[in-house]
């Protein structure tokens, strides 16, 4: 029977918009999607959302390296991410970005409420500054030794070994990730969220049973060591949202990232023209359920900062956090050199999505355990379970039904008690899906598959088919096999969406959880076609080799004007306004004796003459050709004494140098002396 319908909002952690989706990411998105698909099969109203985490210095710097704007980079990355998730049949209702109007408005709203309620504190801090790059260093651009567990090579905000969070200034022997320089200390005013004010609430939430035991235990350690105020601001230059009424200060990426869950849902509601659901799901007393699927590396942010921010701004807290472990490949950390750092898109060129969905599902539980993708075991398990046990059950029976009975199943079950055994298992399997004990669900289903195949072996329809006068028996046996196959595939539908579609086409019937108690009797099925192909180790070898080649290609240096000459540090409008650019007429141009780089230009500014030395000789071997051209010059540059004379300004040119220098000229109609604005 269908349960009482619940309203459920499910999220996955937001992938960072500076890199491709890999098989480590896919564990979480597959886990969440299987759970969501099960909930939908049971009749619940589920909104499944995600977004790209699109802010922060890493994105700003990578865009500079690529020679594009951050907006262009995150736009391209969003399309790539969405293509990958669609390829794995992740059934999102909405996929958005934290760099959105919805997220900006909600971030400012939450910040304003926290500030009005006294939970935002201002104070001047000493911050690490890269003297070579001329910028304050974000947490992730400082590395050193963890002050808690003394693990080396840890980031400036949290330790990946012990999970501790800290200030970058607490790191032992810090180094700038950008330049390798030893950072120096500089003062800057920052904004802090008063997390300790929420300690009592957070401890009560922890004891409420809303968290996995392992997470609750870890949180207790953090409570015992004492909660600290959380720095939620970053200094320019920074790609993100500027803090209201604080020029040059930006929200730290971890403030607006989880708000991205709300922003994506708001965007979904707006697309639907739904003006009520956002408040219904996020109001403080909401009876909707909210679940975050996340990795164990971001528990601190989701179990402390996020619920405290929501509480302090009068929004509801999550119903639960569903935390998973990491993915290893062949028993070791994913490795680019070994070809086991595998992108989602690369996987789909060599294997189907259902195969990985099945393997991950078979290994997952509700605990925070790491999952090993053993590629040899993967091949064996997919072939043994999906091909030999499940699909083979249909193929062993469908041929007889199609050829001998025109695709029509028997009017009665051959073994009603056996069929009841299969349908009675729905309670145990459903509970396993519900509680995220996915491995248990798969074991239960495969045990039933063994029973079904044993039934067919014992009944031996291939023998019965040769015996005269036993057509009714043959139809009954094969119909029984197909009905058992239907029940198995109904249980597997959350895991294997592509295979399920093919099965539904063959059965001429939807795989519906609530319909399994009624077998298909006297029902016409369609012609059986191959449902799933066996896989082999040659595909694995090709996958690994392709991953190695992608790493080599990615290592090739990025070129282009912005990559070769990155955009300089941001200046203010007042700084720019100091530069006086003027149109100038080149009255004369000549070589400079004793220099193989310079030309001497005589410039007319509309009544005032200037003498300028310019290093453009390599691009203009015939200086006479410049006479009569107009150009643009910096008119208020202090005169510079050179051994050839005094240079009274600078002409504007583009290009990397050598022959590739291009003197800038204004449009026709500009007059000497006019200001360039």
Curated annotation (Swiss-Prot):
Cited InterPro entries: aa-tRNA-synth_I_CS, Anticodon_Met, Met-tRNA-synth_bsu_C, Met-tRNA_ligase_1, Met-tRNA_synth, Methionyl/Leucyl_tRNA_Synth, MetRS_core, MetRS_Zn
**Protein name (database record):** Methionine--tRNA ligase
Renumbered ranges of motif 'HIGH' region: 15-25
Catalytic activity, EC = 6.1.1.10
What are the annotated GO cellular component locations? Answer: cytosol
Tell me the superkingdom of the source: Bacteria
What residue intervals hold the motif 'KMSKS' region? 333-337
Q: Which UniProt keywords apply?
A: Aminoacyl-tRNA synthetase, ATP-binding, Cytoplasm, Ligase, Metal-binding, Nucleotide-binding, Protein biosynthesis, RNA-binding, tRNA-binding, Zinc
Q: How does this chain assemble? A: Homodimer.
Q: Where is the tRNA-binding domain?
A: 575-677
């Amino acid at each position: 029977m269908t349960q009482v319908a619940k309203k459920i909002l499910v999220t996955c952690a937001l992938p960072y918009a500076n890199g491709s989706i890999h098989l480590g990411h896919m564990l979480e998105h597959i886990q969440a999607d299987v759970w969501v698909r099960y909930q939908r099969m049971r009749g619940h109203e589920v909104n499944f959302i995600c977004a790209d985490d699109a802010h922060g210095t890493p994105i700003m710097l990578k865009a500079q390296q690529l020679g594009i704007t951050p907006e262009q980079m995150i736009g391209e990355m969003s399309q790539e991410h969405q293509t990958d998730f669609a390829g794995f049949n992740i059934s999102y209702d909405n996929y958005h970005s934290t760099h959105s109007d919805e997220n900006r408005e909600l971030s400012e709203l939450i910040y304003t409420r926290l500030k009005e309620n006294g939970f935002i504190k201002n104070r001047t801090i000493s911050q690490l500054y890269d003297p070579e790059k001329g910028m304050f260093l974000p947490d992730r651009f400082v590395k050193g030794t963890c002050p808690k567990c003394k693990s080396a090579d840890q980031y400036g905000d949290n330790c990946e070994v012990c999970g501790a969070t800290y200030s970058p200034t607490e790191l032992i022997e810090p180094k700038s990730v950008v330049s390798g320089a030893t950072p120096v200390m500089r003062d800057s005013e920052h904004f802090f969220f008063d997390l300790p004010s929420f300690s009592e609430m957070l401890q009560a939430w922890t004891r409420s049973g809303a968290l996995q035991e392992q997470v609750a235990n870890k949180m207790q350690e953090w409570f015992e060591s004492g909660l600290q105020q959380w720095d939620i601001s970053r200094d320019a230059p920074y790609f993100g949202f500027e803090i209201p009424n604080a020029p040059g200060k930006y929200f730290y990426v971890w403030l607006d990232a989880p708000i991205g869950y709300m922003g994506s849902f708001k965007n979904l509601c707006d697309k639907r023209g739904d003006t009520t659901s956002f408040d219904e799901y996020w109001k403080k007393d909401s009876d909707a359920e909210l679940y975050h699927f996340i990795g164990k590396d971001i528990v601190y942010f989701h179990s402390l900062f996020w619920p405290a921010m929501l509480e302090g701004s009068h929004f509801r807290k999550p119903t639960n956090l569903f935390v998973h472990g990491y993915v290893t490949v062949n028993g070791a950390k994913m490795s680019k050199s070994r070809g086991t750092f595998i992108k989602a898109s690369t996987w789909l060129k060599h294997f189907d999505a259902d195969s990985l969905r099945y393997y991950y599902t078979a290994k997952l539980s509700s605990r925070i355990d790491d999952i090993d993708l053993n590629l040899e075991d993967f091949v064996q398990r997919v072939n043994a379970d999906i091909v030999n046990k499940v699909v083979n059950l249909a193929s062993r029976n469908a041929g007889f039904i199609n050829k001998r009975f025109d695709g029509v199943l028997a009017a009665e079950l051959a073994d009603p008690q056996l069929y009841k055994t299969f349908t009675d298992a729905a309670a145990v399997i459903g509970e396993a899906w519900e509680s995220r004990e996915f491995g248990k669900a798969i074991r239960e289903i495969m045990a039933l598959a063994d029973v079904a195949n044993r039934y067919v072996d014992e009944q031996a329809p291939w023998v019965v088919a040769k015996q005269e006068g036993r057509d009714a028996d043959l139809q009954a046996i094969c119909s029984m096999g197909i009905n058992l196959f239907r029940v198995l595939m109904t249980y597997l539908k959350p895991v294997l969406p592509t295979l399920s579609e093919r099965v539904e086409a063959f059965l001429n019937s939807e795989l519906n959880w609530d319909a399994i108690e009624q077998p298909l009797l006297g029902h016409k099925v369609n012609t059986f076609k191959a449902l799933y192909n066996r896989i082999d180790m040659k595909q694995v070898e090709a996958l690994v080799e392709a991953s190695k080649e992608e790493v080599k290609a990615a290592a090739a240096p990025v070129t282009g004007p912005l990559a070769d000459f990155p955009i300089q540090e941001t200046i203010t409008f007042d700084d720019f306004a100091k530069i006086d650019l003027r149109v100038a007429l080149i009255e004369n141009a000549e070589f400079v004796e004793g220099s193989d780089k310079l030309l001497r230009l005589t410039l007319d500014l509309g009544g005032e003459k200037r003498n300028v030395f310019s290093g453009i000789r390599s691009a203009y071997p015939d200086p006479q050709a410049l006479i009569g051209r107009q150009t643009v010059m910096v008119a208020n540059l202090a005169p510079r004494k050179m051994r050839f004379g005094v240079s009274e300004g600078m002409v504007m040119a583009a290009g990397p140098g050598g022959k590739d220098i291009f003197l800038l000229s204004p449009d026709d109609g500009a007059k000497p002396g006019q200001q360039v604005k």
